[in-house]
């Protein structure tokens, strides 16, 4: 399967996609287009290049911040003493229920990191909001770390994201 990643086009039908998670399915059907249109999130879709109108997965990115006090001291020591650190948040990620277990979720995460690292927007931390413990385990495979205070929230320093993107580019 040759995946095509692109921004959710305005007016694109969102019928036919389900990931099996009621909250994510509802977001996809009712909110994704509005969030992108109103500037609350960038919605990136994945489809097979042969059938570009059939969505097989999506994710959202948004500007965010994290309190410096939430970052472990070893990392925070190397950052400016601003109260909040600029971040990018991977808020939602979903794969069609019929295609789960085929590493499409991993490709969505890698595309989100690549897209974020190639952006001229300044950010230091990449945030992920996992929906359940099983998802936390998935993100930890990419070397995301848990926040001590919020066990379903994870983070990665930009330099780590850039290393992953660089390794990914070499393997292609």
Across the structure, where does each feature detected by a protein language model lie?
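A structural microfeature
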Residues: 56-57, 148
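Active-site/acyl-donor-binding loops of N-acyltransferases
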Residues: 145, 150-162
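Conserved acetyl-CoA-binding loop-helix of GNAT-fold acetyltransferases
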Residues: 101-114
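Residue-level recognition of the GNAT/N-acetyltransferase active site
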Residues: 91, 96, 100, 131
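Conserved active-site alpha-helix within GNAT-family acetyltransferase domains
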Residues: 121-123, 130-149
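Short amphipathic alpha-helix that is part of the acyltransferase structural core
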Residues: 1-34, 38, 43, 52-54
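Conserved acyl-donor/pantetheine-binding loop and adjacent beta-alpha core of acyl/acetyltransferases
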Residues: 52, 58-92
């Amino acid at each position: 399967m040759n995946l095509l990643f692109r921004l959710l086009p305005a007016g694109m039908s969102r019928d036919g996609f389900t990931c099996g998670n009621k909250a994510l399915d509802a977001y996809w059907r009712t909110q994704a287009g509005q969030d992108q249109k109103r500037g609350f999130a960038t919605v990136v879709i994945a489809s097979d290049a042969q059938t570009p109108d059939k969505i097989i997965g999506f994710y959202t990115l948004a500007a965010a911040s994290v309190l410096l006090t939430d970052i472990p001291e070893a990392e925070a020591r190397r950052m400016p003493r601003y109260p909040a650190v600029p971040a990018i948040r991977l808020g939602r990620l979903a794969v069609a229920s019929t295609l789960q277990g085929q590493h499409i979720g991993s490709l969505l995460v890698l595309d989100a990191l690549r897209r974020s690292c190639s952006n001229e927007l300044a950010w230091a931390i990449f945030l992920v909001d996992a929906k359940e413990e099983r998802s936390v385990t998935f993100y930890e495979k990419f070397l995301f770390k848990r926040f001590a205070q919020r066990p379903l929230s994870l983070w990665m320093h930009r330099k780590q994201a850039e290393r992953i993107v660089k390794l990914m580019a070499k393997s292609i």
